[in-house]
C-alpha cells in the first residue's frame, strides 16, 4: 500500500516541503534562519492575537490598555514582552538571512530574492505600525515624523499624508487604521512566505560552495529537522533571556510617557532595527532626497543579480569580495549607531560618510571586486 504521506493531497504538500525535500548535504547553520523566521512569525501572530483581545485602539485608552495588559491580564506582561522582543529577534534573523543571501549568492534565484525583498518591506511596515500602538511619546512622534516624510512626494504629498492620517494630524483615526493594518499584515506576510517557499523549492536551495548540488542531496527529515530544532532552542533561549531578564533593554524610555502632541521629545528615533535606514535618511539635508535614499537603502537589493560580475556564485572562495561584504556589515553597524545619536558634530559627518560608503560598496566596490577576482583567476 502506498504511504498516505505521499498520496494525500494536503499531507503530500507538507511531505514535499519538510520531509522528503531533497536538500544539499553541505548547507551550514546560516541556512537555519529561514525556519527561525517562520518560528518568529508564529510567535508574533500568537502573542499579537492575545494582545489584541485586551488592547483598545482609542487615543484616550491605548496607553491605559497596554498598562492594563501588563498589570491585570494573566501573564499579560510576559505576552507583551515576548511580542516586543520577538520583533527584535525577527529582525536579527531577517538581517542575517539577507546577509547570508548576499554572501553566498542566493540572489541569483531572482524570483525567490524579489519576493524576499517584498517580505522585508512588509515586515518593516508591520513593525513600524506596531510601534505606534502603545501610544507613548516615541510612538506618537515616530508616527508623526515618518508619515510626514510622504509629504516630500511632489504634487500629491500633502494630500497623501492627510489621507493616511485621516485628518490634519496623527490622531484617533490614524491609531485605529494602524491597528487594523498591524493586525492583517502578518497574515499577508504568511501568504508571501508561502510564495517565497514555493519559488525556493522550484530551484532548490543554494549551498555554501555555490555549485550545483544535484549529485549530493539528502532528505530534509531527519537531518535538517534536527538541525533546525537546535536553532529553534538557541533562538528561544536568547528570546526568553531577553524577555525575562532585560524586557525593556531595546525599548525607548520615552515610551513610558503617554503621547503628548504639545511636548516634543529631544531626540526622535525609531526602534533599533530601523536606525540604519533612519541614519541614511538624516544624512541628506534635502527632505525628498532623504526619502529617496531611505527607500533605495532597501530597494537597492533588487539590483544584486544585475551587479553580480563574478564567475563564481558564492563568496566562499573570493577573499576580496569577502572583505567588501564585511566592510558593508561594519558600515551598517556604524549607521545603526549613528541613527541613535543626536544630530550634531561629529555624528552628522560620520553618518554622511557611512551612507555614501553603503551605496558605494553595493553599486561599485562589490562588482569591481568580482571582476578583479575573475582577472586574478584568468577567467576573463
Swiss-Prot record:
Task: Provide GO CC annotations from the record.
Answer: mitochondrial inner membrane; respiratory chain complex III
What is this protein called in UniProt? Answer: Cytochrome b
The gene that this protein is the product of is MT-CYB
Tell me which Gene Ontology terms the entry assigns under biological process: mitochondrial electron transport, ubiquinol to cytochrome c
Question: Where is heme b b566 bound in this sequence?
Answer: 97, 196
Per UniProt, the cofactor note for this protein states: Binds 2 heme b groups non-covalently.
Annotated positions binding a ubiquinone: 201
| Localization per record | Mitochondrion inner membrane
